[in-house]
Every structure is written in structure tokens, then in C-alpha cells.
Amino acid sequence: MTDSVVTRFAPSPTGFLHIGGARTALFNWLYAKKHGGKMLLRIEDTDRERSTEAAIGAILDGLKWLELGWDGDVIYQFSRAARHREVAEQLLADGKAYRCYATAEELTAMREKARAEGRTRLYDGMWRDRDPATAPSDVKPTIRLRAPQTGETVIEDQVQGRVVWQNENLDDLVLLRGDGNPTYMLAVVVDDHDMGVTHVIRGDDHLINAARQKQIHDAMGWALPSMSHIPLIHGPDGSKLSKRHGALGVDAYRAMGYLPAALRNYLVRLGWSHGDQEIFSTEEMIAAFDLSSVGRAAARFDFAKLENLNGHYIRHADDQSLVKMFEDVLDHVVPSRDELKAKLNDTTRAQLLKAMPALKERAKTLIELIDSAYFIFADRPLELDPKAQALLTPDNRKLIGQLHSALENVETWSGATTEAALRAFAEENSLKLGAVAQPLRAALTGRTTSPGIFEVLDVLGRQESLGRLKDQAKD
């Protein structure tokens, strides 16, 4: 163990980076940053049947997108199997573990008997003190920890408080399977020790594992890292977060147009509080984060709150950064965006940047931002949505023709000059500005909602604006 803080994020690569896993990574990252320490990344790929390269890629991509960088190389648990076996053999040599030759049928009978009698200890220790010379030759033995049978195993958890287990209720857990492969329980303890992990911060669904892992630490004479078991994330209805509540993977939130800074900010407040403060910069998070302010109760995921928070981050984002995020997110949304991506060039990027102050005021996600920027990329003649189609009546199409003539006389094109021309036209024809602006919006954007009409004219420029009006005008 070192004096400096070392945390670790240790996901299993059996699927995407879950939103709960992302919060665990965030808490580990924040704690390490606050204390000038390191966060290590360990991929717990001992389950060879379920672990996939695609899942590993999704985890690494998710962490990079969330800007939760790790220190050093990624550690792959399976690659350390020889070291795990070495520790099991050492415990065996020291008399702190033993070979168990129980057959699958015997183990099943033990479990059924224990459950029928209401006992949590499922293995009866039949090979704990038996002479190995009596072992059957046709059974490949497991190696089990010789766990204490009396007294208590105690964890002083930084979140859960003092947690106590009666040793009489805990099994002699398996360290090595019959095929020689280490178990998850052993691998975690050995890796945490060898990596110099000082603080284990993980979901409270691992709390029962802590008792078993402490017994391995004690048997090896190793110091136990500080333990913090944080509450799980539940859905809005209070049940465990599942697919029926909506998206689960970080990649899905990326595709839905959430900003990494907004998702980090939202996740940090799930289970942790700092007074009434809701908005945190990364620097503020690092400075304020502490484990003592993490509650024990499960946090509820509120999608509306996340969306509102994301809207805040979009409104306060730098316009140039939003253009880049706009472009980046196109790689992660449905294929229908490919056509839009093909139209990104210096001209449309400049138009997008010019429109961004207006676009970002209305958008809560990057997807909404994309939708509201549609008018920039639309091909002539515009495809009108049903509401715009209904608005462009024969009379309003005649009005569009008159507006085309009025705007054609604007020499220096800008939002201000086109506004002056339209206001003058409305006044001369005894029309309210809204009666002019709405048909104009439909003709210019194909929709009935958009940024301010003068901003639209400014962004599209003289030639494109007049061309679109001519397409929809009726002489």
C-alpha cells in the first residue's frame, strides 16, 4: 500500500458502459483527483464466455467521451491468472486453504439441505479437515479458503458505516475452480493488492463481496483498502433501473445528444450532495467531492432533470465548440443523418456558427439542435412539413411574392437591414409583423418553428433567401 490515493474502476466487459458504472467511474475519478492520486482502469474479463472485445471498446470509448481519463495502462484481469493461482497455492501451502473434492451432486445436495433448513451457509465444509489421501481420483478439486468459523468479519465502510457479518454464516469460498481458473473473488483481491489500490469505491451490490474479500486479505496478511459502497441508481418509479425506464448505456446518451459535461454534472448529484448547488464545473466537483456526503439511499434517475441540465450546458457552451459537437454527434445517431453530414462544408459550418446563438437558446439536446438547424442544410425547393404547407395558402403565397420584391431591394444584407425592410413593408400594408413573419418562416425553413426570422434571413444570406422565397411565391 502506498501513501498516495489510488482508486480503480473495474468494469466487466459483458455489455455497454452502464450509466451506473459511469457514475462509479466518476466518483473514483473525482476522489483520486481531489487527493492528488491516481485512478486505474481494470477490465475484469475473467468470465471468458460473456466478455467481448466490443464491450471493452464500448467501455473505453464511454470513459473517453465522458473525459474520465485513467492513469497508466489498462489492466486486463484474465492476463494475471498465473499470479492469482500463485496466491491460491501460497494459501494452500500455509494451511489457509484446502482442496475440496466435493462432486457437483454433493454440492447440490448440500445447498438444498441448507436452504431447506434456512441456513445461508451452503457448503458444509466436508473437505475442510478430511485427509486428502481419501480423495477420489476422478474428481478435479477446487481450492477453498479456510475461512474463520467463529467471530465476526467487519467492514468500516465510508458510506454504509460499520457492517458486520457472522462468520458462521459465511462459506469457505472457492479460490480456484476445478479447471484451475481463479474465481472473481480471488482475482479482485490479488489485483487490488498488487495495483496498490487504497480506496475501493463501487456499487453497494458488491457489499456482500466485501466480507469474503476481507477474509482473503486477512489470510494473506494484506491491509484492506478503504471501502465505500455507493447506492445503486433506480428508475423514476423507485425500482431498479432497467431498459423499460429508457436508455442504460452511456453510448445511448451520447447518441441522444447529451453533452459529456452535463452527464457528468447530473451523475455526480445522484447519491452525492453539496448543499443546494446543482451546477458544478469540473473544478468545483473535484474541490467539493467527498465520500461523507454520499447517502445510503438509492438515487432516482430523473430524465427531465437531465434534459433541463443539458439545456443549461448547451446555452452556456462556446458556439465554436457546439459546432464541433454538432458534427461529432452525427457519427452516433441514426443513419438518416448521413445526408446532413455530407452537406457539412466551410459554408454551412460558417452558417451554423452564425446561427448558433439563436439555435442553442431553444435546444435541450444536440439532436434538437440538429433539428432546428435543418433549414441551413435543406435543398431547394424545400419540402414543407404539414403545418407549413397549411400556412402557405394561396393568399400567403401571394404575400411571399410581395415580400420577395421588398427584400430584393435590400442592398446590404443583414439581420438588421432585412428587419427594417420587413417592418416597413408591414407598416405600408397595414399588417402586423407576425402576419408577415409566419408565412415567411414557412417559406424559408419549411417549418412553422425556427430561430428568429431575421436571424434566419441573415444566416441564409441574400441569394439563398430570395431563391427560397421565389420557389414558394405566387404571382
Curated annotation (Swiss-Prot):
Q: What's the EC number here?
A: 6.1.1.17
Q: Which PANTHER family match?
A: GLUTAMATE--TRNA LIGASE, GLUTAMATE--TRNA LIGASE, MITOCHONDRIAL-RELATED
List the GO molecular function terms.
ATP binding; glutamate-tRNA ligase activity; tRNA binding; zinc ion binding
The protein's name in its UniProt record: Glutamate--tRNA ligase
Keywords (A to Z) from UniProt? Aminoacyl-tRNA synthetase, ATP-binding, Cytoplasm, Ligase, Nucleotide-binding, Protein biosynthesis
The catalysed reaction is: tRNA(Glu) + L-glutamate + ATP = L-glutamyl-tRNA(Glu) + AMP + diphosphate
Q: Where is this motif: 'HIGH' region?
A: 11-21
Q: Name one GO biological process term.
A: glutamyl-tRNA aminoacylation
Gene name of the encoded protein: gltX
Cell wall biogenesis/degradation as UniProt keyword: no
Please give the family membership noted in the entry: Belongs to the class-I aminoacyl-tRNA synthetase family. Glutamate--tRNA ligase type 1 subfamily.
Compartments reported by the entry: Cytoplasm
For whether the record's keyword set contains Electron transport, the answer is no
